[in-house]
Design a protein with these regions (language model features):
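Tandem CBS (Bateman) regulatory domains
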Residues: 1-9, 47-78, 91, 95, ...
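Hydrophobic, helix-prone linear segments
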Residues: 1-49, 53
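A glycine-centered beta-loop-beta connector
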Residues: 26, 34-49, 94, 102-117, ...
Length: 263
C-alpha cells in the first residue's frame, strides 16, 4: 500500500494572512494544522500549538490577533515524501521524527499524512495486536488543577510539548484543556482586553474558565482497538485512562497508539 491511498487533502493558507483568519479556517475545516504557502508554493506548517505560543508571547500582548501574521507561527516540522512511498516507510518516519508527512510531486502538494490518517488505517486494517489494551499505550499524565492560571497551563504544555492537559479537582478528573482551547482563549482575550491591561488581566484567567467538561475516558483494560474506534468516532486526539477507582493513571494520544504498530 502507498501513501497516496490514505493521504488527505490539506487545507492551505498564505503566509501573509493573519492568525485570526487562520483560526477561523481551522474551525471551519475542523483541523489543528494548515499548510502555509508563499504565492502558492509550500512554505511551512501552521499548528494550533504554535498559535497558542505566539498569542501568549508577552512582547505581542499589545497586538490583536488580526495584526499578527501567519508567518510568525509557521514551522518547518514536516518531511516531504513521494506519493508512491510505502505505508510502512511512512509510518516509520512518523514514529521516528514525530512530524507530519507532506506528499509532493513535481514541486506540487498532493496531500498530507497526519496521525489521524494513520489511526484510520489502523482501524480499517486491524494493525494492532488483539492483546493490546489501554494500559499498553498510555503515557504518564501531566496534569493541572482547575484553579490554575491559563498562563501556567500554556507554559507547561509548551515546555512538555503536549497538546492536551487533564484538569483535576480534589484529585479527580473534571476536564481537559487542549492547545485549541488555549489558542482560542488567548485570541478572545486579546480582542476583549486592551493592550495596556492585558499583562495584569491575563493572570485572572483560570483553567476552569476554558476547560471542556464531560471528558470521555477509558479504563486500563479497554482493548486498544476499542480506544481507536472511540477516538475516531468522537473525533478526539487523546483519551484519559482511569483505574477502577476512577483515578487518572494515564493518557493515550494518537501518537502513543501509532508507537504500538509493529511490522
Amino acid at each position: 500500500m502507498q501513501v497516496n491511498e490514505i493521504m488527505s487533502d490539506p487545507i492551505t493558507i498564505e503566509k501573509s494572512d493573519t492568525i485570526s483568519n487562520a483560526l477561523y479556517t481551522m474551525e471551519k475545516y475542523n483541523t489543528r494544522r494548515l499548510i502555509v504557502t508563499n504565492e502558492g508554493e509550500l512554505y511551512g506548517i501552521l499548528t494550533m500549538r504554535n498559535i497558542a505560543r505566539q498569542l501568549g508571547t508577552r512582547k505581542k500582548y499589545a497586538l490583536p490577533a488580526s495584526s499578527i501574521h501567519v508567518t510568525t507561527a509557521t514551522t518547518k516540522d514536516f518531511i516531504k515524501i513521494l506519493p508512491d512511498t510505502n505505508i510502512k516507510e511512512a509510518i516509520t518516519l512518523m514514529k521516528e521524527k514525530q512530524v507530519i508527512l507532506i506528499v509532493v510531486e513535481n514541486n506540487g502538494v498532493l496531500g498530507w499524512i497526519t496521525p489521524h490518517e494513520i489511526l484510520k488505517l489502523i482501524n480499517s486494517k486491524n494493525l494492532l495486536p488483539d492483546y493490546l489494551c489501554a494500559e499498553d499505550a498510555m503515557r504518564s499524565p501531566i496534569t493541572a488543577n482547575s484553579g490554575d492560571r491559563v498562563v501556567h497551563a500554556r507554559r507547561l504544555m509548551l515546555e512538555k510539548d503536549i497538546g492536551r492537559l487533564p484538569i483535576l479537582e480534589d484529585g479527580l478528573l473534571v476536564g481537559m484543556v487542549s492547545e485549541k482551547d488555549l489558542a482560542y482563549a488567548m485570541h478572545a482575550f486579546r480582542n476583549i482586553v486592551s493592550g495596556s491591561k492585558q499583562d495584569t488581566r491575563i493572570k485572572n484567567l483560570i483553567l476552569a474558565d476554558i476547560m471542556k467538561r464531560g471528558v470521555i475516558s477509558v479504563i486500563t483494560d479497554t482493548p486498544l482497538s476499542d480506544v481507536v474506534n472511540l477516538m475516531l468516532k468522537e473525533d478526539i486526539g487523546s483519551v484519559p485512562v482511569l483505574d477502577l477507582k476512577d483515578e487518572l493513571v494515564g493518557i493515550i494520544t494518537r501518537r502513543s497508539i501509532i508507537s504500538q504498530i509493529s511490522f
